[in-house]
A protein has these predicted regions:
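A structural signal for small-residue-enriched, beta-sheet-centric alpha/beta enzyme cores
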Residues: 1-80, 84-94, 104-404
Length: 404
Protein backbone atom coordinates (compact mmCIF):
# COMPACT_ATOMS: atom_id res chain seq x y z
CA UNK A 1 0.00 0.00 0.00
CA UNK A 2 1.39 3.38 -1.01
CA UNK A 3 2.07 5.70 1.95
CA UNK A 4 -0.15 8.77 2.32
CA UNK A 5 3.00 10.92 2.19
CA UNK A 6 6.74 10.72 2.67
CA UNK A 7 9.47 13.11 3.72
CA UNK A 8 11.66 14.85 1.14
CA UNK A 9 14.39 17.46 1.21
CA UNK A 10 13.96 21.13 0.48
CA UNK A 11 11.94 22.65 3.32
CA UNK A 12 9.77 25.61 2.30
CA UNK A 13 11.19 25.69 -1.23
CA UNK A 14 10.34 22.04 -1.95
CA UNK A 15 6.85 22.92 -3.29
CA UNK A 16 6.73 24.28 -6.84
CA UNK A 17 6.95 28.02 -7.34
CA UNK A 18 8.58 29.08 -4.08
CA UNK A 19 11.94 30.75 -3.45
CA UNK A 20 13.66 32.03 -0.33
CA UNK A 21 16.71 33.98 0.78
CA UNK A 22 18.44 35.57 3.77
CA UNK A 23 20.98 38.34 4.42
CA UNK A 24 22.61 40.12 7.32
CA UNK A 25 21.04 43.55 7.76
CA UNK A 26 22.89 44.42 10.96
CA UNK A 27 20.02 44.09 13.44
CA UNK A 28 22.08 41.66 15.50
CA UNK A 29 24.94 43.97 16.35
CA UNK A 30 28.32 42.33 16.76
CA UNK A 31 27.31 39.18 14.88
CA UNK A 32 28.95 39.82 11.55
CA UNK A 33 28.39 36.28 10.29
CA UNK A 34 24.73 35.94 11.30
CA UNK A 35 21.90 36.55 8.84
CA UNK A 36 18.96 38.30 10.50
CA UNK A 37 16.57 38.99 7.62
CA UNK A 38 14.73 36.34 5.62
CA UNK A 39 12.30 36.29 2.71
CA UNK A 40 9.93 33.66 1.32
CA UNK A 41 7.99 34.30 -1.89
CA UNK A 42 5.61 32.56 -4.23
CA UNK A 43 6.38 33.34 -7.84
CA UNK A 44 2.70 32.82 -8.63
CA UNK A 45 -0.58 34.14 -7.19
CA UNK A 46 -1.35 32.49 -3.88
CA UNK A 47 -3.69 32.45 -0.92
CA UNK A 48 -2.61 32.42 2.71
CA UNK A 49 -3.91 31.44 6.12
CA UNK A 50 -2.46 32.33 9.49
CA UNK A 51 -2.80 32.04 13.23
CA UNK A 52 -1.42 34.69 15.56
CA UNK A 53 -0.62 35.03 19.24
CA UNK A 54 -3.54 35.19 21.65
CA UNK A 55 -1.53 37.50 23.91
CA UNK A 56 -3.46 40.77 24.32
CA UNK A 57 -0.16 42.62 23.86
CA UNK A 58 0.43 42.05 20.16
CA UNK A 59 3.58 43.13 18.34
CA UNK A 60 3.36 45.57 15.44
CA UNK A 61 4.14 42.95 12.76
CA UNK A 62 1.33 40.75 14.07
CA UNK A 63 -1.16 43.62 13.72
CA UNK A 64 0.09 44.60 10.26
CA UNK A 65 0.17 41.02 8.96
CA UNK A 66 -3.35 40.33 10.24
CA UNK A 67 -4.60 43.40 8.37
CA UNK A 68 -2.74 42.44 5.18
CA UNK A 69 -4.08 38.90 5.39
CA UNK A 70 -7.67 40.16 5.47
CA UNK A 71 -7.04 42.37 2.45
CA UNK A 72 -6.66 39.54 -0.06
CA UNK A 73 -3.97 37.42 -1.68
CA UNK A 74 -0.47 36.93 -0.28
CA UNK A 75 2.79 36.52 -2.17
CA UNK A 76 5.61 36.96 0.35
CA UNK A 77 6.74 36.77 3.97
CA UNK A 78 9.61 38.90 5.25
CA UNK A 79 10.94 38.20 8.73
CA UNK A 80 13.69 39.53 10.95
CA UNK A 81 15.34 38.24 14.11
CA UNK A 82 17.07 40.22 16.84
CA UNK A 83 14.24 42.70 17.39
CA UNK A 84 10.59 41.90 18.17
CA UNK A 85 9.18 45.31 17.18
CA UNK A 86 6.80 44.86 20.12
CA UNK A 87 5.66 47.52 22.60
CA UNK A 88 6.92 50.15 20.15
CA UNK A 89 3.69 52.11 19.65
CA UNK A 90 2.76 53.86 16.43
CA UNK A 91 6.42 53.95 15.38
CA UNK A 92 6.44 50.16 15.45
CA UNK A 93 3.36 49.97 13.24
CA UNK A 94 4.91 52.34 10.72
CA UNK A 95 8.16 50.37 10.73
CA UNK A 96 6.32 47.10 10.13
CA UNK A 97 4.49 48.72 7.22
CA UNK A 98 7.76 50.10 5.84
CA UNK A 99 9.26 46.62 6.05
CA UNK A 100 6.45 45.21 3.91
CA UNK A 101 6.59 48.18 1.56
CA UNK A 102 10.33 47.81 0.95
CA UNK A 103 9.90 44.19 -0.11
CA UNK A 104 6.76 44.90 -2.15
CA UNK A 105 8.45 47.64 -4.17
CA UNK A 106 11.48 45.49 -4.88
CA UNK A 107 9.29 42.61 -6.07
CA UNK A 108 6.67 44.69 -7.88
CA UNK A 109 3.90 43.68 -5.47
CA UNK A 110 1.27 45.52 -3.48
CA UNK A 111 2.14 46.22 0.16
CA UNK A 112 -0.77 44.09 1.36
CA UNK A 113 0.63 41.06 -0.49
CA UNK A 114 3.58 40.97 1.92
CA UNK A 115 3.30 39.65 5.47
CA UNK A 116 5.86 40.69 8.09
CA UNK A 117 7.20 38.87 11.15
CA UNK A 118 9.73 39.81 13.81
CA UNK A 119 11.34 37.99 16.73
CA UNK A 120 13.80 39.13 19.35
CA UNK A 121 13.94 41.59 22.21
CA UNK A 122 10.80 43.53 23.14
CA UNK A 123 10.61 47.30 23.56
CA UNK A 124 13.24 48.47 21.09
CA UNK A 125 12.47 50.32 17.88
CA UNK A 126 13.19 48.33 14.76
CA UNK A 127 16.22 49.68 12.86
CA UNK A 128 14.09 49.96 9.74
CA UNK A 129 16.70 51.83 7.71
CA UNK A 130 19.05 48.84 7.99
CA UNK A 131 16.31 46.54 6.77
CA UNK A 132 15.37 48.80 3.86
CA UNK A 133 19.00 48.96 2.76
CA UNK A 134 19.28 45.17 2.89
CA UNK A 135 16.13 44.37 0.89
CA UNK A 136 17.67 44.69 -2.62
CA UNK A 137 20.32 42.10 -1.72
CA UNK A 138 17.65 39.96 -0.07
CA UNK A 139 15.62 39.86 -3.27
CA UNK A 140 18.69 39.32 -5.44
CA UNK A 141 19.59 36.19 -3.47
CA UNK A 142 16.21 34.49 -3.84
CA UNK A 143 16.73 30.82 -4.63
CA UNK A 144 14.71 27.65 -5.03
CA UNK A 145 17.16 26.15 -2.53
CA UNK A 146 16.92 28.91 0.06
CA UNK A 147 14.92 27.18 2.78
CA UNK A 148 17.75 26.48 5.22
CA UNK A 149 19.23 29.98 5.12
CA UNK A 150 15.86 31.48 6.07
CA UNK A 151 15.36 28.89 8.81
CA UNK A 152 18.72 29.92 10.25
CA UNK A 153 18.12 33.66 9.81
CA UNK A 154 15.03 33.66 12.04
CA UNK A 155 16.73 31.79 14.89
CA UNK A 156 17.20 33.55 18.24
CA UNK A 157 18.00 31.23 21.16
CA UNK A 158 17.53 28.16 18.96
CA UNK A 159 20.44 25.72 18.85
CA UNK A 160 19.49 24.20 15.49
CA UNK A 161 17.42 25.18 12.47
CA UNK A 162 14.05 23.52 11.98
CA UNK A 163 12.71 22.54 8.57
CA UNK A 164 10.75 19.73 6.96
CA UNK A 165 9.06 18.87 3.66
CA UNK A 166 6.72 16.10 2.53
CA UNK A 167 5.34 14.86 -0.77
CA UNK A 168 1.78 13.58 -1.07
CA UNK A 169 1.17 11.15 -3.98
CA UNK A 170 -2.21 11.52 -5.65
CA UNK A 171 -3.77 9.87 -8.69
CA UNK A 172 -1.52 10.96 -11.54
CA UNK A 173 -0.08 13.87 -9.59
CA UNK A 174 1.57 14.94 -6.36
CA UNK A 175 1.53 17.87 -3.98
CA UNK A 176 4.23 19.08 -1.64
CA UNK A 177 4.21 20.83 1.72
CA UNK A 178 7.27 22.48 3.24
CA UNK A 179 7.84 24.22 6.52
CA UNK A 180 10.36 25.99 8.74
CA UNK A 181 10.04 27.16 12.33
CA UNK A 182 11.92 28.88 15.11
CA UNK A 183 11.44 28.63 18.83
CA UNK A 184 13.23 27.42 21.93
CA UNK A 185 12.22 29.48 24.97
CA UNK A 186 8.99 31.24 25.96
CA UNK A 187 6.88 28.47 24.44
CA UNK A 188 3.35 27.97 25.74
CA UNK A 189 0.09 26.62 24.30
CA UNK A 190 -1.81 29.06 22.08
CA UNK A 191 1.40 29.99 20.25
CA UNK A 192 4.43 31.63 21.81
CA UNK A 193 7.77 33.09 20.67
CA UNK A 194 7.33 30.83 17.74
CA UNK A 195 7.39 31.58 14.04
CA UNK A 196 6.36 28.97 11.50
CA UNK A 197 6.16 29.39 7.73
CA UNK A 198 4.52 26.69 5.60
CA UNK A 199 4.31 26.54 1.82
CA UNK A 200 2.40 24.22 -0.48
CA UNK A 201 1.77 23.91 -4.20
CA UNK A 202 -1.70 22.50 -3.55
CA UNK A 203 -4.76 24.28 -4.93
CA UNK A 204 -7.18 25.16 -2.15
CA UNK A 205 -9.48 28.03 -1.26
CA UNK A 206 -8.43 30.59 1.31
CA UNK A 207 -11.33 29.56 3.53
CA UNK A 208 -10.45 25.87 3.53
CA UNK A 209 -6.74 26.60 3.98
CA UNK A 210 -7.55 28.68 7.06
CA UNK A 211 -9.73 25.93 8.45
CA UNK A 212 -7.04 23.28 8.03
CA UNK A 213 -4.23 25.54 9.25
CA UNK A 214 -6.11 26.50 12.42
CA UNK A 215 -6.94 22.87 13.15
CA UNK A 216 -3.36 21.78 12.52
CA UNK A 217 -1.93 24.46 14.82
CA UNK A 218 -4.35 23.42 17.55
CA UNK A 219 -3.04 19.84 17.34
CA UNK A 220 0.63 20.78 17.27
CA UNK A 221 2.02 24.17 18.32
CA UNK A 222 -0.78 24.70 20.83
CA UNK A 223 0.22 21.42 22.50
CA UNK A 224 3.78 22.36 23.46
CA UNK A 225 5.10 24.21 26.48
CA UNK A 226 8.60 24.93 27.76
CA UNK A 227 8.18 27.70 30.31
CA UNK A 228 4.53 28.75 30.26
CA UNK A 229 5.29 32.23 28.91
CA UNK A 230 3.30 33.50 25.93
CA UNK A 231 4.92 35.77 23.37
CA UNK A 232 3.71 38.94 21.69
CA UNK A 233 4.92 37.83 18.26
CA UNK A 234 4.09 34.22 17.48
CA UNK A 235 2.76 33.55 14.05
CA UNK A 236 2.08 30.59 11.78
CA UNK A 237 1.55 31.34 8.09
CA UNK A 238 0.63 28.86 5.36
CA UNK A 239 0.78 29.91 1.69
CA UNK A 240 -0.73 27.84 -1.15
CA UNK A 241 -0.07 28.69 -4.81
CA UNK A 242 -1.81 25.85 -6.67
CA UNK A 243 1.17 25.02 -8.89
CA UNK A 244 0.85 21.25 -8.43
CA UNK A 245 -1.59 21.21 -11.37
CA UNK A 246 -4.40 19.38 -9.58
CA UNK A 247 -8.03 20.48 -9.10
CA UNK A 248 -8.77 22.62 -6.06
CA UNK A 249 -9.16 20.44 -2.98
CA UNK A 250 -12.52 20.42 -1.24
CA UNK A 251 -13.87 18.68 1.87
CA UNK A 252 -14.91 15.11 1.17
CA UNK A 253 -12.29 14.57 -1.51
CA UNK A 254 -9.46 12.11 -0.95
CA UNK A 255 -6.88 14.75 -1.86
CA UNK A 256 -8.26 17.07 0.84
CA UNK A 257 -8.00 14.42 3.55
CA UNK A 258 -4.48 13.44 2.49
CA UNK A 259 -3.40 17.07 2.47
CA UNK A 260 -4.82 17.60 5.96
CA UNK A 261 -3.00 14.53 7.25
CA UNK A 262 0.30 15.65 5.73
CA UNK A 263 -0.12 19.21 7.02
CA UNK A 264 -0.70 17.87 10.53
CA UNK A 265 2.46 15.80 10.26
CA UNK A 266 4.48 18.85 9.21
CA UNK A 267 3.26 21.04 12.07
CA UNK A 268 3.60 18.26 14.64
CA UNK A 269 7.16 17.50 13.59
CA UNK A 270 8.12 21.18 13.75
CA UNK A 271 6.46 21.47 17.16
CA UNK A 272 8.49 18.52 18.42
CA UNK A 273 11.68 20.11 17.11
CA UNK A 274 10.85 23.27 19.03
CA UNK A 275 10.21 21.47 22.30
CA UNK A 276 13.39 19.42 21.95
CA UNK A 277 15.30 22.67 21.49
CA UNK A 278 13.94 24.23 24.69
CA UNK A 279 16.46 26.38 26.54
CA UNK A 280 18.55 24.19 28.87
CA UNK A 281 16.26 21.19 28.33
CA UNK A 282 17.42 17.71 29.38
CA UNK A 283 14.06 15.92 29.30
CA UNK A 284 11.37 15.77 26.61
CA UNK A 285 8.08 14.69 28.18
CA UNK A 286 4.70 13.82 26.70
CA UNK A 287 1.88 14.39 29.19
CA UNK A 288 -1.18 12.37 28.19
CA UNK A 289 -4.39 12.88 30.13
CA UNK A 290 -7.13 10.42 29.23
CA UNK A 291 -10.42 9.29 30.68
CA UNK A 292 -11.57 12.86 31.25
CA UNK A 293 -15.22 13.83 31.34
CA UNK A 294 -14.69 16.52 28.67
CA UNK A 295 -12.04 17.65 26.23
CA UNK A 296 -11.60 20.88 28.20
CA UNK A 297 -11.06 18.93 31.42
CA UNK A 298 -8.39 16.82 29.74
CA UNK A 299 -6.68 19.92 28.41
CA UNK A 300 -6.81 21.76 31.74
CA UNK A 301 -5.26 18.84 33.59
CA UNK A 302 -2.56 18.21 30.98
CA UNK A 303 -1.56 21.86 30.83
CA UNK A 304 -1.49 22.21 34.63
CA UNK A 305 0.93 19.29 34.93
CA UNK A 306 3.03 20.43 31.97
CA UNK A 307 3.47 23.96 33.34
CA UNK A 308 4.03 23.03 36.98
CA UNK A 309 7.43 24.34 38.11
CA UNK A 310 7.59 21.71 40.86
CA UNK A 311 6.82 18.87 38.45
CA UNK A 312 9.36 20.09 35.90
CA UNK A 313 12.06 20.42 38.58
CA UNK A 314 11.34 16.87 39.73
CA UNK A 315 11.80 15.61 36.18
CA UNK A 316 15.15 17.36 35.97
CA UNK A 317 16.16 15.60 39.19
CA UNK A 318 14.88 12.30 37.77
CA UNK A 319 12.55 12.05 40.75
CA UNK A 320 9.23 10.22 40.10
CA UNK A 321 7.38 12.56 42.43
CA UNK A 322 3.84 11.61 41.42
CA UNK A 323 2.45 13.64 44.33
CA UNK A 324 3.31 16.85 42.51
CA UNK A 325 1.45 15.55 39.46
CA UNK A 326 -1.60 14.77 41.58
CA UNK A 327 -1.39 18.25 43.08
CA UNK A 328 -1.33 19.89 39.63
CA UNK A 329 -4.27 17.81 38.43
CA UNK A 330 -6.18 18.82 41.54
CA UNK A 331 -5.74 22.57 41.08
CA UNK A 332 -6.31 22.47 37.32
CA UNK A 333 -10.09 23.04 37.79
CA UNK A 334 -10.74 19.89 35.77
CA UNK A 335 -13.40 17.54 37.10
CA UNK A 336 -11.53 14.78 38.97
CA UNK A 337 -12.06 12.20 41.69
CA UNK A 338 -8.92 11.49 43.68
CA UNK A 339 -9.74 7.82 44.28
CA UNK A 340 -10.03 7.12 40.55
CA UNK A 341 -6.76 8.61 39.27
CA UNK A 342 -4.01 6.37 37.88
CA UNK A 343 -0.57 7.70 36.88
CA UNK A 344 2.00 5.91 34.72
CA UNK A 345 5.57 6.66 33.62
CA UNK A 346 6.11 4.98 30.23
CA UNK A 347 3.43 2.46 31.16
CA UNK A 348 4.91 1.70 34.59
CA UNK A 349 2.27 2.34 37.23
CA UNK A 350 3.15 4.94 39.87
CA UNK A 351 -0.29 5.68 41.29
CA UNK A 352 -3.31 3.38 41.36
CA UNK A 353 -6.74 4.65 42.41
CA UNK A 354 -5.11 7.77 43.85
CA UNK A 355 -2.75 5.77 46.07
CA UNK A 356 0.93 4.76 45.79
CA UNK A 357 1.45 1.66 43.66
CA UNK A 358 3.65 -1.26 44.65
CA UNK A 359 6.18 -0.38 41.93
CA UNK A 360 9.66 0.05 43.46
CA UNK A 361 10.83 3.67 43.31
CA UNK A 362 14.06 2.59 41.61
CA UNK A 363 11.99 1.16 38.75
CA UNK A 364 10.24 4.50 38.28
CA UNK A 365 13.54 6.38 38.51
CA UNK A 366 14.91 4.20 35.73
CA UNK A 367 12.19 5.56 33.42
CA UNK A 368 13.01 9.16 34.33
CA UNK A 369 16.66 8.63 33.45
CA UNK A 370 15.57 8.51 29.81
CA UNK A 371 15.75 11.72 27.79
CA UNK A 372 12.22 11.08 26.52
CA UNK A 373 9.32 9.54 28.40
CA UNK A 374 5.52 9.71 28.66
CA UNK A 375 3.44 10.52 31.73
CA UNK A 376 -0.07 9.09 31.40
CA UNK A 377 -2.82 10.26 33.76
CA UNK A 378 -6.08 8.32 33.60
CA UNK A 379 -8.97 10.13 35.29
CA UNK A 380 -11.50 7.32 34.64
CA UNK A 381 -14.39 9.75 34.24
CA UNK A 382 -15.04 9.61 30.50
CA UNK A 383 -13.39 9.18 27.11
CA UNK A 384 -11.86 12.60 26.44
CA UNK A 385 -8.09 12.97 26.17
CA UNK A 386 -5.40 15.55 25.50
CA UNK A 387 -1.64 15.51 25.00
CA UNK A 388 0.93 18.19 25.75
CA UNK A 389 4.63 18.04 24.89
CA UNK A 390 6.78 19.68 27.53
CA UNK A 391 10.21 19.66 29.17
CA UNK A 392 12.00 19.74 32.49
CA UNK A 393 13.25 22.96 34.11
CA UNK A 394 17.00 23.23 34.61
CA UNK A 395 19.59 25.55 36.17
CA UNK A 396 20.80 26.21 32.63
CA UNK A 397 17.37 27.62 31.73
CA UNK A 398 17.49 30.00 34.69
CA UNK A 399 21.04 31.06 33.86
CA UNK A 400 20.15 31.64 30.20
CA UNK A 401 17.18 33.84 31.09
CA UNK A 402 18.76 35.93 33.87
CA UNK A 403 19.40 38.63 31.27
CA UNK A 404 19.12 39.25 27.53
Amino acid sequence: MEPAFFEIRGGITAPKGFRASAVRSGIKEGLADKNDLGLVISDFPAVAAATFTTNKIKAAPVRVSAAHLRAGDTRAIVANSGNANACTGSTGIQNAKRMAQAVARQLGLKDRQVLVCSTGRIGRNLPIEKIEMAVPALVARLSSEGSEVVARAIMTSDTFHKEIAVEVPLAGAKIRIGGIAKGAGMINPDMATMLCFITTDAAISKRELQKLTSASVEQSFNCVTVDGDMSTNDTTICIANGQAAIPAMEPGHESYDKFAEALNFVTQQLARMIIEDGEGVTKFVEVHVKGAATYQDARKAAEAVSNSILVKCAWYGEDPNWGRIMDAVGYSSAQVREEMIDIFFDGVVATLHGLPSSTPEDTLKEVLRNRKFTVTIDLHLGSAEYKVFTTDLTPEYVKFNMGE
